[in-house]
């Protein structure tokens, strides 16, 4: 579960990670009241679970409470990459001497944890990794030993933080590790981690992802779930017991099985590079069954995304045979009627594949293109999305 910034900062306070005081509100009047209470210039920050807030006008400096009110009026209701701003964090503005970057995350490839630290904070970390890789330290963390002050200082030193802040930064880094472990997080990211003119270290921004598999031992995390702010397509998918995650691309993905769906994301992203940077629009696993009702629900969710230009249905027939899947696709298109208005690229393989292909061929639906291999299907879906 991804947290809003204000929720992440609640965990900062719980674990004594230094940050700036502030409160959340959903009205312009509330923003003015909080700014008045703080009594200093503030930052008015849109609360959305996506990057790029600043470039979209979702983060503003307010010198006075009236400025906070005016900014809040403009930010509330703002559409940031499909996310509508419904809440604001109003936090005390901080004097900044330098900006750094710090994160803890799972290193799945090496089956361990990873600390990342850089003196180049305040910008997209992907940009730092691409343009100044020598300025980004990637430090493996032993899960048993963890991060004590000495190791935290080493992380800061490898990230090229100035010598005069190493000890202070180490304290904050150790506290962030404590949070990471205690809260069963898969990501704790601070960008920027700043040094003030008086050499204090503050975590000004916060991005935290919590591991839903640990909910059974983290009952307090339930309060962080915000159904009103959850993507409506994700809510619709949840109602049908479908595993759906919205992304920012143009090719809708439907796969039966999480592994196949993940592989489909990869091949579409690769194929999309040849077609103007087309990307996957979602992850959707319809599970082992692909009945007409399940397929219709999946298509309904995927086609509800206005960014989707084509759909790639990638199914491997196992217990559910390919002929049953093909029948489900044909029936689903009939059930959806005019709502099924984007081209579908279908790739079938596995149990009874020839019969499945025959059913789709004879149906001769104008929206359906039947393709033999996954690579060809990904290329076709990306081509259609770029047209």
Curated annotation (Swiss-Prot):
GO terms for molecular function: ATP binding; magnesium ion binding; succinate-CoA ligase (ADP-forming) activity; succinate-CoA ligase (GDP-forming) activity. Its EC number is 6.2.1.5. GO terms for cellular component: cytosol; succinate-CoA ligase complex. One of its GO terms (biological process) is tricarboxylic acid cycle. Keywords: ATP-binding, Ligase, Magnesium, Metal-binding, Nucleotide-binding, Tricarboxylic acid cycle. Belongs to the succinate/malate CoA ligase beta subunit family. HAMAP family: Succ_CoA_beta. This is Succinate--CoA ligase [ADP-forming] subunit beta. It comes from Mycobacterium bovis (strain ATCC BAA-935 / AF2122/97). The lineage of its organism: Bacteria, Bacillati, Actinomycetota, Actinomycetes, Mycobacteriales. The gene is sucC.
